[in-house]
Amino acid sequence: MTELNKLTVADSVKGLKNKDFTSKELVNAHIKQIEKYKNLNAYVTETFDLALKQAEEADQNYAQNKARTLEGIPFAVKDLFCTKGIRTTACSNILKNFIPHYESSVTKNIFDKGGVMLGKTNMDEFAMGSTNITSCFGNVISPWKANDDNSDLVPGGSSGGSAAAVSGFMASAALGSDTGGSVRQPASFTGLVGFKPTYGRCSRYGMVSFASSLDQAGIFTRSVLDSSIMLEAMMGFDEKDSTSINAKVPELQSAIGSSMKNMKIGVPLSLGEGGIIEHDIMKMWHDTIELLKNAGAEIVDITLPHAKYGVAVYYVIAPAEAASNLSRYDGVRYGLRVEYENMTLDEMYEMTRSAGFGEEVKRRIMLGTYVLSSNCMDAYYFKAQKVRRLVANDFNNAFTKVNAILLPTAPSAAFKIGEKQNDPTIMYLNDLFTIPASLAGLPCVSVPAGLSARGLPLGMQIIGKQLDEYNVLKVASTIETGVKHIKFEPAGF
């Protein structure tokens, strides 16, 4: 039998229902794996006692035929979802000992369906980063290695801990957040399915904010079916979140394996021009186009003329919102406070924020403050908002002709830790293909679609219309089936 911690969510549910094993056994298998691979630094807070208690309750529910959708399934939580009574830090020194008094809506939804929490995962500080090297707890190491080099690789970011946990079989699934690609890009780097739903599908209540108009909860799984199961549990209207969409949660599992007949897939190949994409990625893109064509889909050439400005727009709007959101961390109400005798209030603010925030967060606060200044607001912030609307209009126009859009998740495979660290602009280009869909608030997924020449996983991204998670999953499932001969599993795990 497959090792328990290697089972998918769907297979775990099936095994628990059939009483092939207990939830406690399933959880203990994951705890053993977490203990074995502590060096990867995927978790920053372990909640094993809670997990075993929840597993016992799950086993009782199975015994009494009262099992819920995710009864007894062990999952991990990115450390920016507030968990009542459990440390939540956003991996920043300024929140290092913060313990919330309330539960985020997304984690509550999963608990209400029977989920078992193994712990909180590492991340880039305040979700700002693409490599998980800005965490105050240290960087995360990917479970993957290249076949020609034993160097440690980045897991992607900002949800790198969640990606490493699921890829390294330390969780069946893991919550992440996606602002400009923070679920999709790590999923591509670690051979996982990473789904970001339509903006507003998942409540932001209890999520530590980065950029409020872009932040959205997402999920890492090892199969497209698992993604559909977790999404059904996570999504739903929440009156505590003013941006929450009051729409019925769709039944998504029937999308898996459904026919591609009459499906039109848009392909913006012009976005790959200019030598920005590695050869392996370009080959995977063309191979996936052929795969979908052979599955019965119609391939349509489209253009997204303003998508190339997405990164520039994002790095005006997101830092501006971050500068506003992070102004609440001042040492007065909660979190870190630096103080000494005869200190003025202004000095306390300055010293606390200087000591509490890391370099990347400071950089983005400075950038955001600058673009919101009276001299620059028209030239940068308002102009960026106008271009954001043009990016959204490009997608709206494309979706009059197609059901979904296909493009790579990232321009490269995972790279060595520290390799691109000294040039923030090169780092920011990691999100070149993920940012446009975030600006438009569209549902999208990264699904493993190939391996590089160095044996590293590569992801394809599928983007759908607003609220059309169903068709996104349908296309992802077709790709998954088409590449099932490839083993997306790190060596030695």
Swiss-Prot record:
Q: Does the keyword Mitochondrion apply?
A: no
* Cross-referenced Pfam families: Amidase (PF01425)
Q: Describe its assembly.
A: Heterotrimer of A, B and C subunits.
Q: What does this protein do?
A: Allows the formation of correctly charged Gln-tRNA(Gln) through the transamidation of misacylated Glu-tRNA(Gln) in organisms which lack glutaminyl-tRNA synthetase. The reaction takes place in the presence of glutamine and ATP through an activated gamma-phospho-Glu-tRNA(Gln).
Q: One GO cellular component from the entry?
A: glutamyl-tRNA(Gln) amidotransferase complex
Residues at the active site: K78, S158, S182
Enzyme superclass (EC): ligase
NCBIfam families recorded for this chain? Answer: gatA
GO BP annotations of the record are:
translation
Asked if the keyword Protein biosynthesis belongs to this entry, the reply reads yes
Enumerate the GO terms in the molecular function aspect. Answer: ATP binding; glutaminyl-tRNA synthase (glutamine-hydrolyzing) activity
Q: What is this protein called?
A: Glutamyl-tRNA(Gln) amidotransferase subunit A
Where are the disulfide bridges?
none
Similarity-based family: Belongs to the amidase family. GatA subfamily.
- Enzyme nomenclature, EC number: 6.3.5.7
What reactions does this protein catalyze? Answer: L-glutamyl-tRNA(Gln) + L-glutamine + ATP + H2O = L-glutaminyl-tRNA(Gln) + L-glutamate + ADP + phosphate + H(+)
Q: Which organism is it from?
A: Rickettsia typhi (strain ATCC VR-144 / Wilmington)
Q: Which UniProt keywords apply?
A: ATP-binding, Ligase, Nucleotide-binding, Protein biosynthesis
